[in-house]
A protein has these predicted regions:
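Macromolecular interaction modules
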Residues: 2-134
Length: 134
């Protein structure tokens, strides 16, 4: 999804590379993220003006992540990546400006603290530039 249907403008995207809390196994982390946090995000999406939310879960059992990182001399990977899209910068910036939006943001952050190690989980705001789409 490279552009919104509104005048073909690029969507604003938050990318969040996640590391689990040390006491959680990868399986417990991913199960909680998918089955508990995912529905929680869905329930607050309208209040936060979120257009799209995608979870990408690491597949450690294949050993491919370690091989890919080792081939580049890269550090160890993440346990997953969350991606959230908004139609405009204004939508993103104003998402928590209403009482409903502030409460939704508070609830989601409180839940994240149950399974995400925020100190090792970088996030950033971006605009996509699709290069290949088939």
């Amino acid at each position: 999804m490279g552009a919104s249907c509104l005048e073909d403008r690029p969507l604003i995207k938050l990318v969040f590379c996640l590391k689990r809390l040390p006491h959680l196994s990868l399986e417990k982390f991913q199960t909680y993220w998918l089955d508990t946090h995912g529905p929680l995000v869905r329930s607050h999406a309208a209040a936060l003006k979120i257009r799209r939310y995608v979870q990408s879960h690491t597949t450690e059992n294949l050993g491919l992540n370690q091989a890919a990182a080792a081939s580049r001399g890269a550090p160890g990977g993440f346990d997953g990546v969350a991606e959230l899209w908004w139609d405009t910068v204004e939508d993103f910036a104003s998402a928590a400006s209403t009482p409903e939006g502030r409460e939704a943001a508070r609830i989601l952050l409180e839940d994240e603290r149950r399974f995400i190690d925020h100190s090792r989980s970088p996030l950033w705001i971006s605009v996509e530039h699709p290069i290949v789409e088939r």
